[in-house]
Curated annotation (Swiss-Prot):
Gene3D superfamilies found in the cross-reference section: 3.40.1350.10
PANTHER family assigned: UPF0102 PROTEIN YRAN
Entry's Gene Ontology molecular function annotations: nucleic acid binding
Domain of life: Bacteria
SUPFAM superfamilies: Restriction endonuclease-like
Disulfide bond positions: none
InterPro entries reported in the protein's UniProt record: Restrct_endonuc-II-like, tRNA_endonuc-like_dom_sf, UPF0102_YraN-like
This protein's name: UPF0102 protein Cpar_0015
Family (UniProt): Belongs to the UPF0102 family.
Amino acid sequence: MHAPQWLGAEGETIAAKYLAAQGYRILDRNYRFHRNEIDIIALDGGVLCFIEVKTRTSIGKGHPAESVTPRKQKEIIRAATGYLAGLDDPWVTCRFDVIAVLAGSLDERSIREYEIEHLKAAFIVADEG
């Protein structure tokens, strides 16, 4: 059985609330650059964080963070590059995080219980030069 379509958006809302409670300043959600998207862009002190959120109802097909494949990482990096190009000072310290939300129980259109795991610096930009 596939998870409801609203599950991803609900997981992103949970992640944004979690980050705000941890002192992060949310700058943008669902930022799009061409066909690439970043779920959450936030400031952690002076560090600009590009955050991918993965929500699952079980770990039957692996940990949610495992679905952030090298291809998905490249898409996030492309979107981050577009975001940075629009800043007055694009030479800020950046970090790429993944937040995994494992939903324990669901209501009609919400997640009632969940576990959350924040993987800071989950991947880095490799020089392909």
